[in-house]
């Protein structure tokens, strides 16, 4: 039976008169899948419901933050109790201490942390700190990696920028862009060449230890280690953008999983439990350069607000090492089911995984960087997305975004998803 999206269509027609493109973040417009966005109403566990009453198994999870699934009862209870006491004070609260300690305990190389209100704020602040500490201006990032919408970072970016086919953004001054150098992800030799030419001018390398905004692209062997060596040799800082990978890839984040310690880590998503949050952390020597301890300025009205700190603490305190065994078990089943169905119906495919992040690509080429990610059949992906939605499976509406698993997902959810793969691929093969 074909699902009705009539109320979503009406809501979108109204929204486009009120907000640019009808949304408050570009990827939500569903442009790359050639349909109007689906407006959501509620979520419980791994299931969400749209305003037309259609239900879905959710693999978007608000683009990653909801690692416990939707409306976890203990998290909801804690948020409500905190809200009843006050949503923000403009003064410190002890919950900031609790979340800070919890995060730092799981990141042994990080000694101090500053909370902000978004991942973009975290990466922008991390770059300012790196430039302030080193006295240098240039940075190196990787093509297709998305680090938020700060001017310095909207150069050959992924995520919604890639989805819309915009390699850069108008409004980024040329004087800013010239200080951002780029090479392909996983291209250590390219990074070495940049350092040979600009090593004395490079403040930092910023990298997703697992790229998550060109699909899911893990680092090849030696890539992160090589960046660590390059930055240390040339007096630059290594920034791991773990806004997406933080507590998704492993209990100790991607840096713990791969055994490479950066100078600065940026975080977001999971550490806010579904509320707006970001953070940057580093060694005490670096972080004590941040105001008011040091001269590098950073501030925020709602930074460390009680609601986000409470949601983050209640979420992280419910993750232990067994959580990631659960993710691996379900991820194995989901990957095997996708591969089996795609192979059965001769659908070109590649699967990349890292912890509870999974990337399905419609290409037979190994996906190791943005160029190979773009070899995926985008028209096929769009049809796949629409048909999976009809089967009650909600996926990211972009080839360049990964799927997420939560603790609320079960083997039954995975089995239903795999059954949908078979049904949809049978239709695509006709």
From Swiss-Prot:
Pfam families: Aminotran_3
Matching PROSITE patterns: AA_TRANSFER_CLASS_3
Cofactor: pyridoxal 5'-phosphate
Keywords: Cytoplasm, Isomerase, Porphyrin biosynthesis, Pyridoxal phosphate
Modified residues (N6-(pyridoxal phosphate)lysine): 269
Gene3D superfamilies: Aspartate Aminotransferase, domain 1, Type I PLP-dependent aspartate aminotransferase-like (Major domain)
MF term (GO), any: transaminase activity
Main location group: cytoplasm
CDD domains: OAT_like
GO biological process: protoporphyrinogen IX biosynthetic process
EC class: isomerase
Subcellular location: Cytoplasm
EC number assigned by the record: 5.4.3.8
One GO cellular component, as annotated: cytoplasm
Pathway of action: Porphyrin-containing compound metabolism; protoporphyrin-IX biosynthesis; 5-aminolevulinate from L-glutamyl-tRNA(Glu): step 2/2
Catalytic reactions of this protein: (S)-4-amino-5-oxopentanoate = 5-aminolevulinate
Subunit structure: Homodimer.
Family: Belongs to the class-III pyridoxal-phosphate-dependent aminotransferase family. HemL subfamily.
Name of this chain's protein: Glutamate-1-semialdehyde 2,1-aminomutase 2
């Amino acid at each position: 039976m074909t699902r009705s999206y009539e109320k979503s269509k009406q809501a979108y027609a109204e929204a486009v008169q009120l907000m640019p493109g009808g949304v408050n973040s570009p990827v939500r417009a569903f442009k790359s899948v050639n349909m109007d966005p689906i407006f959501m109403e509620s979520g419980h566990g791994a299931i969400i419901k749209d305003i037309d009453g259609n239900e879905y198994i959710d693999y978007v999870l608000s683009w990653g933050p909801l690692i416990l699934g939707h409306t976890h009862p203990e998290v909801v209870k804690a948020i409500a109790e905190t809200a009843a006491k006050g949503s923000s004070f403009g003064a410190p609260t002890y919950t900031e201490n609790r979340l800070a300690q919890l995060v730092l305990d799981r990141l042994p190389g990080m000694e101090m942390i500053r909370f902000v209100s978004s991942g973009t704020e975290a990466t922008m602040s991390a770059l300012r700190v790196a430039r302030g500490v080193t006295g240098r201006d240039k940075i190196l990032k990787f093509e297709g990696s998305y680090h938020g919408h700060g001017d310095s970072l909207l150069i050959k970016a992924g995520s919604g920028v890639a989805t819309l086919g915009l390699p850069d953004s108008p409004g980024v001054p040329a004087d800013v862009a010239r200080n951002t150098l780029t090479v392909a992800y996983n291209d250590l030799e390219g990074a070495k060449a940049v350092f040979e030419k600009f090593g004395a001018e490079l403040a930092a390398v910023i990298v997703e230890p697992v790229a998550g905004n060109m699909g899911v692209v893990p680092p090849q062997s030696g890539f992160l280690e090589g960046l660590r060596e390059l930055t240390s040799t040339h007096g630059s800082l290594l920034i791991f953008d773990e806004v997406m990978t933080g507590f998704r890839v492993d209990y100790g984040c991607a840096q713990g999983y791969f055994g490479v310690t950066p100078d600065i880590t940026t975080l977001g998503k999971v550490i806010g439990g579904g509320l707006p949050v970001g953070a940057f952390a580093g060694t005490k020597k670096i972080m004590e350069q941040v105001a008011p301890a040091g001269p590098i300025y950073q501030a925020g009205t709602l930074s460390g607000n009680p609601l986000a700190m409470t949601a983050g603490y209640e979420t992280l305190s419910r993750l232990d090492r067994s959580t990631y065994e659960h993710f691996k078990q379900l991820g194995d089943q989901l990957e095997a089911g996708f591969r089996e169905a795609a192979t059965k119906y001769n659908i070109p495919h590649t699967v990349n995984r890292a912890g509870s992040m999974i990337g399905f690509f419609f290409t037979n080429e190994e996906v190791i960087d943005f160029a190979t990610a773009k070899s995926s059949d985008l028209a096929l992906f769009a049809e796949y997305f629409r048909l999976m939605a009809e089967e009650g499976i909600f996926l990211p509406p972009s080839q360049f975004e990964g799927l997420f698993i939560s603790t609320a997902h079960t083997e039954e959810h995975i089995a239903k998803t795999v059954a949908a793969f078979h049904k949809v691929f049978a239709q695509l093969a006709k």
